[in-house]
Amino acid sequence: MSFRAPNLIRSTVGRRAGQTLNLRSQVIRRRFATEGGPEITKPSAPRSSNTGYIFAGLGVAAVGAAYYFYGTGRTEHDSTNKADTVVREAVATVEAKTGLRRGKDEYQKVYNRIAETLDKEGYDDGSLAPVLLRLAWHASGTYSKADGTGGSNFATMRFKPEAEHSANNGLHVAREHMEKIKQEFPWISYGDLWTLGGVCAIQESGGPTIPWRPGRIDGYAAQVTPDGRLPDATQAQDHLRFIFNRMGFNDQEIVALSGAHAMGRCHPNRSGFDGPWTFSPVTFSNQYFALLRDEPWQWKKWTGPAQFEDKKTKTLMMLPTDMALVKDKSFKKYVDIYADNEEKFFSDFAKAFSKLIELGVPERQWAGEPWTMATSD
């Protein structure tokens, strides 16, 4: 991070940087009651051989934090949050550059623990995998490439405004479940935890291997994005392009990511819609595309929002946004490819989903190339 420090900062940077670091330590120890965030566990002491790197990184962060705190006219509360975000970003960057971040084996333990908890008797079709996949998707799909806001970096669905966005109805189930995992591994950020949960859900349900890496940090309620950034299921192809192009996805990636509907079902008390997309809603496959293309569909006669049902069994459903994929010529060609070739779908989905869950995370926060997490079997 670079900026032109005002004269006040130049003359007092040492003293106020120290004050800011002290402020940081106080912030870490308290619970963010006004933000609704969790208590942050004090990190373990760094290895002595890298202490100089850490202090150097935190010194840069302290100067940046001091600038925001003293030089922008913000309220103390806003400045404290902004300063703490700057420090967290700096710490993540230092960890990435000095090799201090926990290794793959530590994150594999988190993955394994999530995998152990996926089966849940009495919940939907007996698995939490679909709702964990949805959590990872929705936590990442708020990104805007125009201003760099949104995405998985700050895990802002922890806060009431975003949690209550209509598109996130029902995701409290996933967040509450993942909170139990967080208690076992308090060092992992929520953004890393939720996206790793999505990767686990896909892989453990027979889907492709998804490249994943840690580096996301937790943010504040002020970083919540506006409502309306996630797809509206009642809309058509123009809406899909508007939503996905904002994140930087093309037509092929839009169709590939829509394949996540291979898993799960809709609920009248959440989205208003009802039913699964496929006959195997806890298995990740290309069945969604085959059914979408090959089955005859009709409007469902009911009192709920407009949706489609299959003519044969009337047990499956498709949303207006799903049907848009076969009505649009550009989208349809990818539906055909994926319906006929599951291997191609898996390959394209893995690339698109890995891209999705990294949206909004500064490149400097990554420690290296993505990992391949081993499945439980």
From Swiss-Prot:
Its cofactor is heme b. Its EC number is 1.11.1.5. Pfam families: peroxidase (PF00141). It is found in: Mitochondrion matrix; Mitochondrion intermembrane space. SUPFAM superfamilies: Heme-dependent peroxidases (SSF48113). The record marks R134 as: Transition state stabilizer. PROSITE patterns: PEROXIDASE_1, PEROXIDASE_2, PEROXIDASE_4. Keywords: Heme, Iron, Metal-binding, Mitochondrion, Oxidoreductase, Peroxidase, Transit peptide. GO terms for cellular component: mitochondrial intermembrane space; mitochondrial matrix. Its main location: mitochondrion. Binds 1 heme b (iron(II)-protoporphyrin IX) group per subunit. It catalyses: 2 Fe(II)-[cytochrome c] + H2O2 + 2 H(+) = 2 Fe(III)-[cytochrome c] + 2 H2O. Forms a one-to-one complex with cytochrome c. Interacts with MID1 (via C-terminus); the interaction may contribute to cellular detoxification of radicals. Belongs to the peroxidase family. Cytochrome c peroxidase subfamily. This is Cytochrome c peroxidase, mitochondrial. It comes from Cryptococcus neoformans var. grubii serotype A (strain H99 / ATCC 208821 / CBS 10515 / FGSC 9487) (Filobasidiella neoformans var. grubii).
